[in-house]
């Protein structure tokens, strides 16, 4: 169960970082960390 949870969180972090890169390249400026 812990192994599955680890993979799920890893996938979530990966997806989040990809989304951040995509949003950052939009040049929108609304999302600024």
From Swiss-Prot:
First-listed, main subcellular location of the protein, grouped into a coarse class: membrane
Pfam families in UniProt: PetN
Transmembrane segments: 2-22
GO cellular component terms, semicolon-separated: cytochrome b6f complex; plasma membrane-derived thylakoid membrane
One annotated GO biological process: cytochrome complex assembly
Quaternary structure (record): The 4 large subunits of the cytochrome b6-f complex are cytochrome b6, subunit IV (17 kDa polypeptide, PetD), cytochrome f and the Rieske protein, while the 4 small subunits are PetG, PetL, PetM and PetN. The complex functions as a dimer.
Name this protein carries in UniProt: Cytochrome b6-f complex subunit 8
Organism expressing this protein natively: Prochlorococcus marinus (strain SARG / CCMP1375 / SS120)
